[in-house]
């Protein structure tokens, strides 16, 4: 009979709860904790109020190199690298702390959250397995993500070389229309 420590099981439940609250998928919970799948499903339902989503995890390193996802992914991986380099926080705890700081930055700057926790977890795995790597921009020297096997060496980040269609999303158009309407209202009230 296997002897289980109540304290260690409590820590695993606490970790799984934190991961669920951050939006981790069931597969991430299974890899990150020692709890059984059945207990994780029950915990997920208890925390979220719904069954965990089914299906495969997102698995495309190309997603991280698109303009907007690259900005958010680069921000996250730079936070993660800083935390792992200058603190004793490692593994899933480092991913959690980094993701919390990423979310805080997004909230403070009123930005749309592009990077989910599961994608952040996948990103760390891609960087650790050298599928993706961090390189410096030749213009601003900021660090950003690129494919590890890219032959080009003079990398320019998405902030220094913004694509022509950047920021032209439906959300940006709606925000622009809202701001224009607010200006019209202020001008009408000023008369």
UniProtKB/Swiss-Prot annotation:
Where along the sequence do coiled-coil regions lie? none
Q: What keywords is this UniProt entry annotated with?
A: Activator, Bacterial flagellum biogenesis, Cytoplasm, DNA-binding, Metal-binding, Transcription, Transcription regulation, Zinc
Report the cofactors. Zn(2+)
Which Pfam families does the UniProt record give? FlhC
GO BP: any one term: bacterial-type flagellum organization
Give the main localization category. cytoplasm
- Its function? Functions in complex with FlhD as a master transcriptional regulator that regulates transcription of several flagellar and non-flagellar operons by binding to their promoter region. Activates expression of class 2 flagellar genes, including fliA, which is a flagellum-specific sigma factor that turns on the class 3 genes. Also regulates genes whose products function in a variety of physiological pathways.
What interactions and quaternary structure are annotated?
Answer: Heterohexamer composed of two FlhC and four FlhD subunits. Each FlhC binds a FlhD dimer, forming a heterotrimer, and a hexamer assembles by dimerization of two heterotrimers.
Q: Belongs to which family?
A: Belongs to the FlhC family.
Give the protein's recorded name: Flagellar transcriptional regulator FlhC
The protein's organism comes out as Nitrosomonas eutropha (strain DSM 101675 / C91 / Nm57)
Gene of this entry: flhC
């Amino acid at each position: 009979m296997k002897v289980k420590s109540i304290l260690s099981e409590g820590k695993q439940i606490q970790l799984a709860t934190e991961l669920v609250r951050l939006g981790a998928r069931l597969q991430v919970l299974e890899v990150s904790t020692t709890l059984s799948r059945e207990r994780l499903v029950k915990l997920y339902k208890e925390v979220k109020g719904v069954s965990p989503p089914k299906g495969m995890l997102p698995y495309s390193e190309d997603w991280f190199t698109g303009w907007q996802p690259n900005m958010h992914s680069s921000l996250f991986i730079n936070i993660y690298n800083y935390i792992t380099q200058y603190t004793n926080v490692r593994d899933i705890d480092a991913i959690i702390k980094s993701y919390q700081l990423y979310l805080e930055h997004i909230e403070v700057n009123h930005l749309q959250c592009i990077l989910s926790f599961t994608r952040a977890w996948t990103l760390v795995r891609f960087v650790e397995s050298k599928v993706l790597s961090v390189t410096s921009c030749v213009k601003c020297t900021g660090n950003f993500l690129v494919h590890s096997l890219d032959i080009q060496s003079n990398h320019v980040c998405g902030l220094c070389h913004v694509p022509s269609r950047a920021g032209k999303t439906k959300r940006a158009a709606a925000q622009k229309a809202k701001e224009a309407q607010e200006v019209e209202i202020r001008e009408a009230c000023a008369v």
